[in-house]
């Protein structure tokens, strides 16, 4: 990793987490040139969740452990992605054309759509995490890396809105960025073997498709992708990936028993 790349990675880490990192000359245009490094931030979140998982699951029941893991993950990113999910839900459920939906997504009030989205996806995340703790705790790492890959996928397939900091990332992201992101995700395969490795491959494919779907939904409802959509992509992708892992395990179990 070159000096410039390391500098921009520090800036990305500072922007997407609450980790106190000194960054001089914070420039979104420059940071966006290395947006694919967000996958490495996914590893940071994943390792953090693994540490929490080992500690809490030793002391508490899985459900309570899952609640605490999700809370501290969201705290580490400053609750920005949940905020994006709430705004995304408000905008999606708003009645009217793209302009009205975008206004609903950007206003400072929380509507019913945002509340329901936040409750539903966080509840699904907690339940899924509690199952994962019972199956294989290493899938926590997969979930966080894939959540960031989902953001990159959404950026790649989406078109940027005019306003907001998210436009810098969406404008720069392309197929090359996504390819690098996928390559950076492949080390996940090294910590699994056999059927579990196939499940991780399914999770990565599911992630890319989820990001594509988020980009298409954003274009239809808002005209493009902004920071709120990217934040929502992170939260929704995590849930979809964890569900795909749980479902794949069940399908493979039935296949093997049959």
Swiss-Prot record:
UniProt entry keywords in alphabetical sequence: Cell membrane, Cobalamin biosynthesis, Magnesium, Membrane, Transferase, Transmembrane, Transmembrane helix
Membrane topology of this protein: Multi-pass membrane protein
Required cofactor names: Mg(2+)
Enzyme Commission numbers on file: 2.7.8.26
Reactions this protein catalyses: alpha-ribazole + adenosylcob(III)inamide-GDP = adenosylcob(III)alamin + GMP + H(+); alpha-ribazole 5'-phosphate + adenosylcob(III)inamide-GDP = adenosylcob(III)alamin 5'-phosphate + GMP + H(+)
The protein's enzyme class: transferase
Pathway: Cofactor biosynthesis; adenosylcobalamin biosynthesis; adenosylcobalamin from cob(II)yrinate a,c-diamide: step 7/7
GO molecular function list: adenosylcobinamide-GDP ribazoletransferase activity; cobalamin 5'-phosphate synthase activity
Gene Ontology cellular-component annotations: plasma membrane
UniProt cross-references to Pfam families, sorted A to Z: CobS
Any single GO BP term: cobalamin biosynthetic process
Transmembrane intervals: 35-55, 56-76, 113-133, 137-157, 175-195, 198-218, 238-258
Localization annotation: Cell membrane
General function of this protein: Joins adenosylcobinamide-GDP and alpha-ribazole to generate adenosylcobalamin (Ado-cobalamin). Also synthesizes adenosylcobalamin 5'-phosphate from adenosylcobinamide-GDP and alpha-ribazole 5'-phosphate.
NCBIfam families the record matches: cobS (TIGR00317)
Name of the protein in question: Adenosylcobinamide-GDP ribazoletransferase
Gene encoding the protein: cobS
């Amino acid at each position: 990793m070159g000096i410039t790349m390391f500098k921009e990675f520090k800036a990305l880490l500072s922007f997407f987490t609450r980790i106190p990192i000194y960054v001089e000359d914070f420039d979104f245009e420059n940071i966006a040139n290395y947006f694919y490094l967000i996958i490495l931030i996914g590893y940071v979140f994943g390792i953090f969740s693994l540490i929490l998982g080992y500690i809490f699951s030793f002391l508490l029941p899985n459900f309570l452990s899952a609640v605490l893991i999700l809370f501290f993950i969201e705290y580490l990113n400053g609750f920005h992605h949940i905020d994006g999910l709430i705004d995304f839900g408000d905008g999606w459920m708003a009645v009217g054309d793209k302009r009205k939906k975008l206004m609903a997504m950007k206003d400072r009030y929380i509507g019913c759509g945002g509340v329901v989205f936040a409750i539903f996806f966080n509840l699904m995340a907690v339940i899924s995490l509690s199952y994962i703790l019972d199956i294989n705790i290493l899938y926590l790492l997969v979930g966080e890396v894939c959540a960031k890959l989902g953001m990159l996928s959404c950026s790649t397939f989406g078109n940027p809105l005019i306003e907001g900091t998210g436009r810098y990332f969406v404008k720069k992201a392309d197929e090359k960025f996504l390819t690098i992101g996928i390559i950076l995700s492949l080390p996940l395969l090294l910590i699994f073997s056999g059927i579990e490795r196939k499940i991780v491959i399914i999770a990565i494919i599911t992630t890319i498709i989820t990001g594509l779907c988020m980009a298409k939904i954003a274009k239809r409802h808002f005209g493009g992708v902004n920071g709120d959509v990217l934040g929502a992509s992170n939260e929704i992708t995590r849930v979809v990936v964890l569900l795909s892992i749980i479902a794949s395990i069940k399908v493979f179990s039935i296949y093997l028993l049959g």
